[in-house]
């Protein structure tokens, strides 16, 4: 029988094959055939469920390359582990959303309590519960289970847009989609929200139905419906908010101050982001008196800041700096960009000198003077 010569390299390879595998699994890596930028890391790049396991040591930033049902095989884990680490995902892989980060490894996790195994059934495109209603995927986090009508959230949609289109109330929408939150900050685009439930028909407002009004209170003032959320109870003058109305438009028309408007309608918020169309806002209260309108023939009063010798015209933008030496009268309809271009200044400086305008310039007030230059 001829002799066989074994090289040292071959011998090392044979020895490695005989050594038992280590009990610690290697860090999971995505398959090479997955289109890659770096989608896995020790820190999440996208928003993630706050109930994700605290001891997560490796994350997958989901951009849709790997279906939910394939995640365990891709990362060398079980579906039970994956669902336990990421409780926002349902047993049928619902709520596995693009643009979210998910845990694919947990170091130092306590052994799970034995129980009913989690299903590993591949997710269907839709879920059909016992009530016979097909639920499209993905859905808003925390959506109720008895939903029978859905609305797909497109990029840029606002809660107000959905309520107006679906003819449902704000209270019902938040009740059926609790994770959206009362300020609508949890509304996720490219998901489906609940806009109707089994056993409850949303109220539809028709053009022939007069808006309901509550019983006239003891002060004799009838409050029209619907109203801005959180509106004060001693209101005696109301303004109907049409589509496209801005806080500035209402203040100018009603000749009231910004401070009073926000005090009487606190849910509107200081940046006017909570102003709901097709509702009534309070623009006057019992015992309160709105400031009289400024006559068009009256020259705006001026003040002279001490020491700098510069006369400051009034009224001015809220939050304007005190060391301003150049001013621009803001006409109704002017935008920050128009002023910046005309005055040859930067947007950063304009917002810094007129902080009340807001970083997005959403609170630029017409018929006031803005600062466009400083000492």
UniProtKB/Swiss-Prot annotation:
GO terms for molecular function: chitin binding. Residues 1-24 form the signal peptide. Keywords: Chitin-binding, Repeat, Signal, Virulence. Residues 108-139, 206-225, 287-317 are annotated as: Disordered. Disruption phenotype: Does not affect virulence on Arabidopsis, N.benthamiana and tomato. Residues 57-104, 149-195, 237-283, 326-372 form the LysM domain. InterPro entries: LysM1-like, LysM_dom, LysM_dom_sf. Residues 116-129, 206-217, 296-317 have a biased composition (Low complexity). Gene3D superfamilies: LysM domain. The keyword Signal applies. Belongs to the secreted LysM effector family. The LysM (lysin motif) domains are small globular domains involved in binding chitin in eukaryotes. Vd4LysM contains 4 LysM domains. In plants, chitin acts as a microbe-associated molecular pattern (MAMP) that is recognized by lysin motif (LysM)-containing plant cell surface-localized pattern recognition receptors (PRRs) that activate a plethora of downstream immune responses. Might have a role in sequestration of chitin oligosaccharides (breakdown products of fungal cell walls that are released during invasion and act as triggers of host immunity) to dampen host defense. Does not play an important role during host colonization. This is Secreted LysM effector Vd4LysM. It comes from Verticillium dahliae (strain VdLs.17 / ATCC MYA-4575 / FGSC 10137) (Verticillium wilt).
């Amino acid at each position: 029988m001829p002799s066989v010569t074994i090289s040292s390299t071959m011998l090392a390879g044979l020895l490695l094959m005989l050594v038992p595998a280590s009990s610690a699994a290697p860090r999971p890596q995505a398959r090479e055939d997955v289109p890659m930028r770096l989608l896995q890391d020790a820190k999440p790049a996208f928003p993630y469920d706050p109930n994700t396991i605290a001891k997560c040591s490796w994350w997958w930033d989901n951009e849709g390359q790997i279906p939910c049902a394939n995640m365990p095989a891709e990362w060398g884990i079980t579906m039970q582990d994956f669902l336990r680490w990421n409780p926002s995902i349902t047993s049928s892989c619902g709520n596995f959303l693009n643009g979210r980060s998910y845990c694919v490894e947990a170091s130092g996790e306590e052994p799970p309590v034995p129980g009913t195994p989690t299903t590993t059934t591949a997710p269907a495109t839709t879920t059909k519960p016992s009530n016979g209603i097909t639920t499209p995927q993905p859905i808003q986090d925390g959506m109720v289970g008895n939903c029978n009508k859905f609305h797909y959230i497109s990029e840029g949609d606002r809660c107000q847009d959905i309520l107006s289109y679906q003819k449902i109330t704000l209270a019902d929408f938040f009740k059926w989609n609790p994770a959206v939150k009362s300020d609508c900050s949890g509304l996720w685009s490219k998901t489906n929200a609940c806009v109707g439930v089994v056993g409850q028909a949303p109220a539809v407002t028709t053009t022939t139905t007069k808006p309901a009004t509550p019983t006239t209170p003891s002060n004799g003032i009838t409050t029209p419906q619907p109203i801005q959320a959180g509106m004060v109870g001693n209101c005696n003058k109301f303004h109907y908010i049409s589509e496209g109305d801005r806080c500035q438009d209402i203040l100018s028309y009603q000749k009231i101050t910004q401070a009073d408007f926000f005090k009487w309608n606190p849910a509107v918020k200081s940046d006017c982001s909570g102003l709901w169309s097709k509702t009534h806002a309070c623009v006057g209260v019992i015992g309160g008196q709105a400031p009289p309108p400024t006559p068009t023939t009256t020259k705006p009063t001026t003040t002279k800041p001490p020491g700098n010798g510069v006369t400051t015209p009034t009224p001015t933008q809220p939050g304007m700096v005190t060391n301003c030496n150049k001013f621009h009268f803001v006409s109704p309809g002017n935008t920050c960009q128009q002023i910046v271009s005309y005055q040859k200044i930067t947007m950063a400086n304009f917002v810094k000198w007129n902080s009340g305008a807001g970083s997005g310039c959403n609170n630029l007030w017409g018929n006031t003077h803005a600062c466009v230059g400083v000492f």
